[in-house]
Amino acid sequence: MKSRGLVRFFFSILAVGALITSIVGFALKWGEYRGLFLTFEAGQIFSVLFWFIGVGMIFSVISQMGFFVFLTVHRFALEILRSSSLWNLLQLFFILFVAFDLMYVRFLFFGESGESLAGYAWLPVFLLIFGVITAYIKQKQSSKKTFVSSLFLMVVITALEWFPALRVNDEDWLYLMLFPLMACNAFQLLMLPKFAAK
């Protein structure tokens, strides 16, 4: 990729992170921010918006670092194992392991008496479904060989990037961080070839 394309790619991901974080941020706290829009308190609206944009850009940078790690690990794994089928099996194992951990470990650490394990299942299931859809689109875009690796990025790498919010376990922060990370990772996965071709 040429330097101009790399810069455009970087700033495009920043924009995706800022946009999604702003939308999710206002949606999560709409009860609080609704009054600002009804009375059109522009100063406070823009103050909150700039904060969301800044946070979203941080999330997008985390996503880009995760994507770089993914590309590096993928390349090294193929060179060391010398078998794409073995690497795919390992990736599938990690995908299932992480998806289970997102449910079970969170339940162990944060579950309260009376809560069921099922209450912690929907976020990893949602992440898996989104990952499968994104990986399917990537497969259609390139080849069948990319499906498992794409799913690995969307589940395992996203979960690693999401760890700060998982550790805090604040519901608003869980959503505020997850959706931008998913969007940025999907954008990088699907749009990198188009930027590289320019």
UniProtKB/Swiss-Prot annotation:
GO CC aspect terms: plasma membrane
Phenotype of gene-disrupted mutants: No effect on sporulation as single mutant, but when associated with deletion of kinA, sporulation efficiency is significantly decreased.
Bilayer disposition of the protein: Multi-pass membrane protein
UniProt record, GO biological process: positive regulation of sporulation resulting in formation of a cellular spore; sporulation resulting in formation of a cellular spore
Subcellular location: Cell membrane
Pfam family, one: KbaA
Keyword terms of this UniProt record: Cell membrane, Membrane, Sporulation, Transmembrane, Transmembrane helix
Main location: membrane
UniProt cross-references to InterPro entries, sorted A to Z: KinB-signalling_activ
Membrane-spanning intervals of the chain: 9-29, 42-62, 90-110, 117-137, 146-166, 173-193
Biological function: Involved in the activation of the KinB signaling pathway of sporulation.
Protein name per UniProt: KinB-signaling pathway activation protein
